[in-house]
Structure formats: structure tokens, C-alpha cells
Amino acid sequence: EPYDVLDIFQENGFAIVADDLAQETRNFRQDVPDDDDALMALARAWNEFDGCSLATDANKPKGQMIIDAVKKYGADAVVVCMMKFCDPEEFDYPILLQEFEAAGVKNLYIEVDQESTAFEQVKTRIQTFAEIL
């Protein structure tokens, strides 16, 4: 996520206890096993990859995985930093929201853009959320 957004979290007293970033932690959640056919091993690992909107999975376990992480790490809330125009993640968000609300997990949705340099709207939303918590 853009560093400016991380600074806004810090300024408002947030501590990030876990993340589920598609190009970060999610990539390291499981190892690709050693195999003579490296491409086949990579394909099998991708086929068995749970909790990623980019990987087709009719069971949609991502919401429960995040809820489990909230409990494991004692998080007060979940902040969904949605990368603009990431259709697979945007498509799954209503499912996540429904699961968060059913589990009583407080949550905030913000849109971010890697190219953005202005974060005033995001800052206002995070400040308001901090006051609610």
C-alpha cells in the first residue's frame, strides 16, 4: 500500500497486527513444494491456494480467514484497503462485508491507488474510524 496511508494509520494510533496484501504476505502464506517439474509444482500450489480473490474458489474462505486472524491477533477491527480497479477483490468485498458484520468485526473500507499523491479523503475516513473505535 502507499506509504502515505501507513503514515496516516500511525498518526491515528493504529497498529497493524496482520495483513493480507495480495503482493505481500499472501505470496508467502504457502511454499511451493520442490518437484522435478517446477512449473507443475507451481500450478498445483496455485490451484490449492485459498483465500485469494484472484484464484477462483467457490467456497470463498477469505472472509473467515481474516476473521480467524482478528481473533488470533486480538485485532480491534479490519481495514480493507482496496486497490482501485482490482475487479476480483472488488467483486468479493460484499461477501467479506457480510461475513464481518455477521461475526461482529468492525471494519472500514478505503480505496487506494498506487499512483495517488493526495490522501485527504482517506485521512478523514481513518480519523473518523479511530474515533469510533
What are these regions (language model features)?
Residues 1-66:
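Redox- and metal-dependent alpha/beta enzyme cores, enriched for Fe-S-associated oxidoreductases
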Residues 57, 86-90, 115-119:
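Acidic-and-aromatic substrate-binding clefts and catalytic sites of carbohydrate-active enzymes
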